């Protein structure tokens, strides 16, 4: 049986790993996606053929030096409830199956919907009960979807893309020596993401780590 999942080539490895962890196989439908440059809000919705719908908490998505920065939004509850209703209605009216990311302005105006899993979903690998990637595989096989609730309310995730001429071992050792809480996960030999949870200086710490990995700074 063939199960094709639309995914950005940058994070395709994470789908393959999720499938392997479940003992399943999937066929990838690779794409190259573009995420809006301005800071915005994003909700991932996953709908299985068995009519089960799961949505993830609203994330704030921004860019820093063309890198994607994701963290829990601080938007008010009234707006969050409104966005949830909009997403639920759009999913039902579109007969969507699989994964879709709904993007809105900070004021709640609809921007777009993408059916391709992209880099702005990697946060879920660290801070959701079940990642977007695992639930995408579950949806493809019409299996019950996993829980989407957050494991923590304070975290920040940023992707990296290191020049191929730079080594990775020494930077990894340096970062872990200075901040044991870093999660540095590779998608390929020189791409991946840095994640950190905590209650202070998250952007400064994570952006420092990404700059160090990419050779922008050397200390």
Q: What are these regions, as identified by a protein language model?
A:
Residues 5-7, 24-34, 158-160, 196:
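Short, hydrophobic beta-strand segments that form beta-sheet elements in well-ordered domains
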Residues 9, 77-84, 126-130, 134, ...:
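Electropositive phosphate-/nucleotide-binding environments in soluble metabolic enzymes
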Residues 22-24, 28-99, 104-108:
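Internal nucleotide-binding/catalytic subdomain
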Residues 84-101, 116-162:
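Active-site "cap" helix and flanking loop/linker of ATP-utilizing ligase/carboxylase catalytic domains
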Residues 108-118:
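A short beta-strand motif that forms the metal-chelation/ATP-contact edge
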Residues 138-219:
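Peripheral (often C-terminal) accessory segments that flank ATP-dependent C-N-forming ligase machineries
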């Amino acid at each position: 049986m063939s199960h094709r999942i639309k995914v950005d080539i940058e994070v395709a490895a994470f789908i393959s790993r999720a499938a392997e962890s479940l003992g399943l196989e999937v066929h990838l439908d690779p794409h190259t996606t573009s995420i809006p440059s301005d800071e915005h809000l994003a909700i991932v919705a996953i709908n299985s053929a068995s009519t089960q719908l799961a949505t993830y908490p609203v994330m704030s998505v921004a860019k820093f030096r063309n890198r994607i920065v994701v963290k829990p939004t601080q938007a008010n509850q009234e707006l969050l409830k409104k966005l949830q209703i909009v997403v639920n209605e759009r999913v039902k009216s579109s007969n969507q199956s699989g994964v879709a990311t709904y993007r809105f302005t900070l004021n709640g105006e609809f921007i777009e919907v993408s059916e391709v899993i992209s880099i702005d979903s990697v946060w879920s690998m660290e801070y959701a009960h079940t990642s977007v990637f695992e639930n995408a595989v579950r949806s493809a096989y019409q299996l019950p979807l996993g829980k989407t609730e957050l494991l923590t309310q304070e975290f920040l995730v940023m992707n990296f893309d290191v020049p191929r001429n730079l080594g990775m071992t020494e930077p990894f050792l340096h970062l872990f020596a200075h901040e044991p809480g870093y999660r540095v996960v590779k998608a390929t030999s020189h791409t991946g993401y840095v994640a950190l949870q905590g209650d202070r200086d998250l952007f400064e710490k994570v952006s420092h780590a990404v700059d160090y990995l990419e050779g922008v700074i050397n200390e």
